[in-house]
Regions:
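A short acidic-Thr-Gly-centered motif at the start of a beta-strand
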Residues: 48-53, 212
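Conserved N-proximal alpha/beta basic substrate-recognition cap immediately N-terminal to
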Residues: 1-48, 66
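Short secondary-structure junctions
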Residues: 10-12, 54-56, 198-203
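Short, surface-exposed charged micro-motifs
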Residues: 143, 208-210
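Short, flexible loop/turn elements at secondary-structure junctions
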Residues: 21, 64, 75, 130, ...
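C-terminal active-site "lid" helix and adjoining low-complexity regulatory extension at the edge
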Residues: 166-204, 211-238
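Phosphate-binding site of ATP-dependent enzymes
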Residues: 53-166
Length: 238
């Protein structure tokens, strides 16, 4: 949340932060950065926020974790009441929520609301779910590896679902296969370099980029301390 707010305050396009539930034990700077958006603790508050904001789909991301653990995508049709929750989390009788490392879709209302209550009860942030660009029936986003002021690597991550993390056996694709216009690649590069420049002591980062469906306008989803390119070697040509 703090990183996302820093990027947004600098005028860089991001997937918007909608709400949060930051535990008191988090560092004060993280709480301060998240104070500009509402706090929600349960499914009822989430539905109220979505209806008030006229938003039908959101991402729920835990404050702690990696490899898509706990990351969930929620879609709600206000008029019909139909719901769908995409998540790797599953209820466990002893442990509460467990990470299955496999994306599942839940559509039963009672099950969805129960899972949402548990997910939102943990430290998390909520972001707007933007429709991603598509390639041959897959939605995709980009993972950029930026080091020492240059873009070293750019990889597409393809998925049939809303979550593209490669840890979920999604499909990596070389950026050249997308045949993106040079102007789009230039815009992605410029955005990544501007983001890294906001952190003078940071020499490398893995930056997740969403390309909006239709316009291909880039938005930063998040920044990571490592490139995390599974099965890829950015130095393979050395």
């Amino acid at each position: 949340g703090a990183c996302k707010e820093t990027l947004a305050h600098a005028g860089l396009p991001v997937t918007e932060l909608l709400a949060k539930n930051i535990p008191d034990r988090m560092p004060k700077f993280a709480q301060d950065k998240a104070a500009v958006c509402p706090t929600i603790h349960n499914a009822a508050q989430l539905l109220e926020l979505m209806q008030r904001s006229n938003i039908s789909q959101v991402f729920i991301k835990p404050v702690h974790g990696s490899g898509a653990a706990g990351v969930s995508a929620f879609r709600w049709q206000h008029r019909s009441g139909k719901m769908a929750l995409y998540t790797c989390a599953m209820e466990h009788p002893q442990m509460g929520l467990a990470n299955t490392k496999r994306l599942r879709r839940f559509s039963d209302t009672d099950t969805v609301l129960r899972l949402l209550d548990q997910l939102l009860g943990m430290g998390c942030i909520l972001e707007r779910w933007h429709a991603k660009a598509q390639y041959q029936g897959y939605s995709y986003d980009l993972r950029a590896v930026v080091q020492d002021g240059r873009l070293d690597y750019l990889l597409a991550r393809l998925s049939k679902g809303p979550i593209t993390n490669l840890q979920l056996n999604n499909r990596p694709l070389d950026i050249d296969a997308l045949e993106l216009p040079a102007s789009v690649v230039d815009a992605v590069t410029d955005l990544c370099l501007k983001a890294l420049a906001l952190y003078p002591g940071l020499t490398s980062a893995g930056i997740d980029i969403l390309l909006e469906q239709g316009s291909l306008r880039p938005r930063i989803i998040e920044m990571n301390g490592q490139g995390d390119l599974i099965y890829q070697d950015i130095y393979r040509q050395n």
